[in-house]
Amino acid sequence: LSRGNPEVEAVLNRNIDYMSGPEWLAREVLKDRWVMAVAGTHGKTTTTAMLLWILEQAGFDAGYLVGGVPRDFPVSARLGRSDFFVIEADEYDSAFFDKRSKFIHYRPRTLILNNLEFDHADIFDSVEAIERQVHHLVRTVPSQGLIIRPALDPHLDNALALGRWTPIQDTAVGSEISRTADWRAELLAEDGSRFMVIHHEQPVATLSWSLTGQHNVRNALAAIAAARHVGVTPDHAVAALCRFSGVKRRMELLADIDGVRVYDDFAHHPTAIATTLEGLRRRVGDEPILALIEPRSNTMKQGVHRDRLLASAERADRVFWANLNGMDWLDTLVAGAGANGRHWIGRSVDELIGLVRDNLSRPCHIVIMSNGGFAGIHGQLVAELQRRSGQEPGPLEP
């Protein structure tokens, strides 16, 4: 709620006591609990769901709050009856009167810092401003707690260099660092669907699952490390993740129609677009990939990441950019890509579906990327594909 909202104005004018949602959560739900928080620019929802699933399989009745829909749970939040609470820790501001990041209120004992990049240009002026907020979060973690982070992340390095008083464990994939990481994954499948988990250079167990991408391998390592901090052995954590179903809107398969597979993904940042498409490319090999991308977040609509956008989708064979809001910079960007036939602009859902139809082959993988509803393109595209295959169009699963 913002200033100008009638309810906000009434509260202020009548001198009614008020607090932000994150502050209420800290006072009424998180107080006296072992808070396990997952923060970072990318992967928060998936990593939170992974950690929660590990604890669930280990018999913990943890409370939780996830900013998405974990497929292994019926709801996105519950109070729980144990001392533990798992929370997705968002860096967005708390309220119109409290511009600190939401996660400042949570006071975690176990903290996962997945990564740090510039985002939320509507409230942050620079990546340094986000680093400062992460530093404020780190200041709240007790000395007997634990911080888990990737070994290679310069912006997290900067945030932690501002001061920290808590032990750190780091994660790495393959041999990306010369020194030894506390947790490491050795890929046994190029697409990340199978890998060995290594702790202090000792093999723990092999994880085989339906997810792809090195970003999800990193997410898994962080979740395993966090679960160990509260007493779940790594081999039990790996066994749980082998049965992990994922999160809705994270490379969620919507339909498979005569060899055309349609996926829904929440990617709304160049890094997320790139890692998602890279994971799919490694799984499907040379099979064609069509990407439908809606730059919808405030940061994307402002064109903050325009210099990275085209390159972020280089693993797709054709990229259809949705310009549903008259973004001149996007038209200019795609026009400047030249006549290579890989990047196209669509100004309506009908036009975008037509572009897909004109570039369709079998087999084919279509990835729809947006952090919103994308004007209902998911159901309309699937219905069009069903009609073309002689099937009766039906509703997508909720």
Please provide the spans of the model-predicted regions.
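Short, charged/polar "capping" segments at the starts of alpha-helices
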Residues: 1-5, 72-73, 153-158, 177-179, ...
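Phosphate-binding loop of NTP-binding sites
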Residues: 1-149, 155-166, 221, 227-230, ...
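Beta-strand->loop->alpha-helix junctions that form or flank phosphate-binding loops
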Residues: 19-26, 64-68, 163-190, 208-214, ...
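A generic local structural motif
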Residues: 22-25, 71-75, 97-101, 132-136, ...
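Short acidic-hydrophobic surface loop/beta-edge motif
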Residues: 77, 195, 253-257
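ATP-dependent carboxylate-amine ligase
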Residues: 135, 161-167, 202-206, 212-215, ...
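Acidic-glycine-rich active-site phosphate/pyrophosphate-binding loop
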Residues: 187-203
